[in-house]
């Protein structure tokens, strides 16, 4: 490892954001260990070492954070039980989502604390990927949402158990900072999307699901199903921009929590139109019943601009173009 600048542990390295972070860290000269239940679905992991294991098992967490008897310089905690609206908002997976994700975070922090005590060091900086789902439902009833500020999180009332667990874990990470001096960074991700994200099977998020539905239509177009009236609004951030913002946060002295998102708000109907535009398909929308989530959610980026000098730069159309074409490649085998 002597030829590497730093060491990093990426938890959830088989997932969408984690696999992209592995690539970024390697490009910066890090030695990287990845850990996940599964290998990346769409490409080989580029991690120097990849451990397949279940982080809800404390013994796996304990082994994962140990870098040849020493602490990692940085840990990126993306591992969670999660999915899109069709997985999160039905209520059918609430117990698993809360139990599995909380167990992972409890195990990782306990393992880092114990390793610090054993080695008498405390150098590890840990990033935790929280979510815009922590924000209260009452602040997201307006589809013309002006943008959620970090201070809007309380009084707490997330609209899903996934959001409650994320909010609990934010507090968990900061409590380990206060009580044990573990350096933490927390970002609240707003709908990250892009190539190599899940695009079928029920856990995909809106951009991937809509790109797939439109790509499945003939060149002449057709009809796609949209949950609800399609007037619910969201903002979506392209994966490369998410990775850049996360790295800036880790390189800074600012702990967060901080929004990482786009301020370009669109309705789901408009998202369909953007996907249809890629191949100039004429697409009708068939509105059906389905899990919707909140009525309107958008990111307010004032804090991250102030603290990190970061802002999103890719228009939604550009990210959808790249994602649509990648999904079409997957469909064509």
Residue ranges of predicted features:
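N-terminal Rossmann NAD(P)H-binding glycine-rich loop of SDR-like oxidoreductase domains
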Residues: 8-28
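Active-site helix of classical SDR
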Residues: 161, 165
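Rossmann-fold cofactor-recognition segment
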Residues: 46-57
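Conserved Rossmann-fold NAD(P)-dependent oxidoreductase catalytic core, especially the SDR/UDP-sugar
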Residues: 106-159
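NAD(P)H-binding glycine-rich loop region in Rossmannoid oxidoreductase-like domains
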Residues: 55-101
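Conserved glycine-rich Rossmann-like NAD(P)H-binding loop of the short-chain dehydrogenase/reductase
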Residues: 30-39
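NAD(P)-dependent short-chain dehydrogenase/reductase
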Residues: 138-147, 171-250, 263-265, 272-279
């Amino acid at each position: 490892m002597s030829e590497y600048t730093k060491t990093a542990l990426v938890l959830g390295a088989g997932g969408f954001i984690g696999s992209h972070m592995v690539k970024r860290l390697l490009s910066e000269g890090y030695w990287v260990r990845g850990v996940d239940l599964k290998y990346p679905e769409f490409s080989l992991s580029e991690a120097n070492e990849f451990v397949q294991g279940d982080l809800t098992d404390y013994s796996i967490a304990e082994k994962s954070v140990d870098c040849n008897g020493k602490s990692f310089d940085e840990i990126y905690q993306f591992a969670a039980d999660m999915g899109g609206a069709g997985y999160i908002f039905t209520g059918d997976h609430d117990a698993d989502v809360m139990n599995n994700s909380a167990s992972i975070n409890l195990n990782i922090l306990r393992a880092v604390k114990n390793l610090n005590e054993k080695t008498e060091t405390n150098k590890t900086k840990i990033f935790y990927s929280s979510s815009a789902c922590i924000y209260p439902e009452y602040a997201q009833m307006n589809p013309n949402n002006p943008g959620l500020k970090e201070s809007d999180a309380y009084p707490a009332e997330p609209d899903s158990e996934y959001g409650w667990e994320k909010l609990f874990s934010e507090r968990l990470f900061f409590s380990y900072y206060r009580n044990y001096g573990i350096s933490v960074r927390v970002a609240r991700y707003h709908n990250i999307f892009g190539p190599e994200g899940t695009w079928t099977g029920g856990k995909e998020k809106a951009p991937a699901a809509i790109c797939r539905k439109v790509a499945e239509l003939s060149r002449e177009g057709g009809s796609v199903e949209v949950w609800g009236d399609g007037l619910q609004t969201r903002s979506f951030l392209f994966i490369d921009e998410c990775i850049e913002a996360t790295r800036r946060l880790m390189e800074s002295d600012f702990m967060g929590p901080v929004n990482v998102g786009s301020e370009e708000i669109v309705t789901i109907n408009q998202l369909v139109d953007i996907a249809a535009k890629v191949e100039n398909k004429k697409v009708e929308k068939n509105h059906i019943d389905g899990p919707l989530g909140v009525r309107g959610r958008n990111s307010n980026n004032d804090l991250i601009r102030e603290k990190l000098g970061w802002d999103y730069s890719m228009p939604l159309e550009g990210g959808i173009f790249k994602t649509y074409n990648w999904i079409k490649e997957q469909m064509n085998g």
